[in-house]
From Swiss-Prot:
MF annotations from Gene Ontology: ribonuclease P activity; ribonuclease P RNA binding
Pfam annotation, one family: RNase_P-MRP_p29
Protein name, as recorded: Ribonuclease P protein component 1
BP-aspect Gene Ontology terms: tRNA 5'-leader removal
Native organism: Methanocaldococcus jannaschii (strain ATCC 43067 / DSM 2661 / JAL-1 / JCM 10045 / NBRC 100440) (Methanococcus jannaschii)
NCBIfam families associated with the record: RNaseP1Mthb
Known function: Part of ribonuclease P, a protein complex that generates mature tRNA molecules by cleaving their 5'-ends.
One cellular component (GO) term of this entry: ribonuclease P complex
Subcellular location: Cytoplasm
Xref: HAMAP family: RNase_P_1
């Protein structure tokens, strides 16, 4: 089960997400569902059905889990998804 403690080592496809900070101000506020992930990007399907490609390194994401929301710096998500799932993360988050 996905929790705030293991989100960095979990599959992101299918999660609801919102961009809360970004270098490109036009990206802030984009909401939707993660439909694809590459090494450096997340593909988000917006509510109107359009897909938007967001670079991980310039955004902060707010993922909606069951019962809570988790804010994640996109730089921590960089890497191929299958490698990130195996990687050990030594960062503690203040909740």
């Amino acid at each position: 089960m996905i929790t705030p403690h293991n989100i960095l080592r979990h599959e992101l496809i299918g999660l609801k997400v919102e961009i809360v900070e970004a270098k490109n101000k036009a990206m802030i506020g984009i909401k939707g569902k993660v439909v694809d992930e590459t090494r450096n990007t997340l593909v988000i399907e917006k509510e109107d059905g359009r897909e938007v490609v967001i670079p991980k390194d310039i955004a902060v994401f707010l993922f909606q889990l069951k019962g809570c929301k988790v804010k994640v710096d996109g730089r921590l998500l960089i890497g191929r998804p299958e490698e990130r799932l195996k990687k050990k993360i030594k960062i503690l988050y203040p909740y």
